[in-house]
Amino acid sequence: MPELPEVETVRRGLTPVLAGARLSRVRINRPDLRFPFPERFVERLEGATVERVDRRAKYLLLPLSTGETWITHLGMTGRFTLDGTQLGEFEEAAPIAGKHEHFSGCAIRDGAATRIGYADARRFGFMGLIPTDQVETHPWFAGLGPEPLGNGFSGAHLVEAFAGKKQNIKVSLLDQRIVAGLGNIYVCEALYRARISPLVAAGSVSKARLETLASVVRDVLNDAIAAGGSTLKDFANAEGGQGYFQHRFDVYGREGEPCRGESAKAGGCTGTVARVVQGGRSTFYCPSCQRK
């Protein structure tokens, strides 16, 4: 599933073409994705101008000139493509299957038209239209915690959120009410960089270590965004290219492999990456340098 860096990469790819563009020739090729498309979806988008392209957690939000905001969640396999437009600097191309394209349209800006496509092979993504002044109170967003790249996220926030919490820190960090948009991959990587065991109770971690963790979370996410996200099975950025952060994983997906020498030099770690299941998700970590 695309996580925050992947969604942010898509947002940055869509912005130069969609922000300020008028939508035209909107089409949907089936009545639903994960949920049915909104009533009169095509009519409500047709002719509207996109004011900007925002992101909240793993959602894309496009406020429109009509007073509504177009919401998209990529689910597990959703992806946008922009034909004829060079976006970002990505390493590989990932062809998109036409039979899975469920939404299309044109973005007209400065006299130029760019075709927009949205494909979702497994159809776990969805689109919605919400009155812009009701977005913050909508059930999709009302319970979300602070953005990990925003000013509201800090070690102090984690200290308060984790106070007395007996649940392990890995699962706690995946709680979208505590921090919005963090997913399994980047929580594993952040805990490794902070040298915190995913097995410890969240409430037992010291303030100093939580300050370090908050800083490391930002670093991991920014590194992933700079690399264009991670390509695991289905993620592709807005032009169909693949992210490359997966080649930098210290622990994720590396069960049985040695703890990376360069990453672990300071602690002299010679451990092996292990995998456990927590909250139904695979957790990868180094038991030697991420001790309880």
Model feature map: region roles:
Residues 22-41, 157-292:
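Basic, nucleic-acid-binding surfaces and adjacent catalytic neighborhoods in DNA/RNA-processing proteins
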Residues 1-125, 251-258, 281-292:
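A cross-family signal for N-terminal binding/gating loops and helix N-caps
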Residues 70-181, 186-193, 201:
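Phosphate/anion-contacting hairpin/loop surfaces
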Residues 53, 127, 273-275:
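Generic structural motif
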Residues 1-4, 148, 152, 206-214:
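Generic detection of long, well-ordered alpha-helical segments
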Residues 40, 44, 65-67, 113, ...:
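Short, glycine- and charge-enriched coil/turn segments that flank and shape catalytic ligand pockets
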